[in-house]
Amino acid sequence: MAVRWYCWQQEALIIQIRLQPRAKGDEVIGPHGDRLKIRITAPPVEGKANTHLLRFLAKTFQVSRNQVYLLSGATSRDKRVRIEKPTKLLPGITPPIRKTVR
């Protein structure tokens, strides 16, 4: 069974991230084991990398910044992030299954 670096909770996307700060550019590298590897330019100092990551994810998933939350990993490279109702999905992410009510 394939290890998944994301899951859905209703319409919210939960992503397990492996962050590489102080990179040359901001980019999503792709799956890295059970995490999604992301590189950002911000340094891991005084929360700058976390703030930059959340802004980058908001832009990538086409949501407002207040729809992106850091759930865990404030001082670690391994993070869990929640994105509320993402408008755009990355390749490899399947949309949530919507249950119909009869």
Curated annotation (Swiss-Prot):
Q: Which InterPro entries match?
A: DUF167 (IPR003746), YggU-like_sf (IPR036591)
Output the SUPFAM superfamilies linked to this UniProt entry: YggU-like
Output this protein's name.
Answer: UPF0235 protein Noc_3000
Gene source species? Nitrosococcus oceani (strain ATCC 19707 / BCRC 17464 / JCM 30415 / NCIMB 11848 / C-107)
The signal peptide annotation in the UniProt record is: none
Under the heading PANTHER family, the entry gives: UPF0235 PROTEIN C15ORF40
Pfam families per the UniProt record, alphabetical? DUF167 (PF02594)
What family is this? Answer: Belongs to the UPF0235 family.
Which terms in the GO cellular component ontology are assigned? cytoplasm
Report the SS bond pairs: none
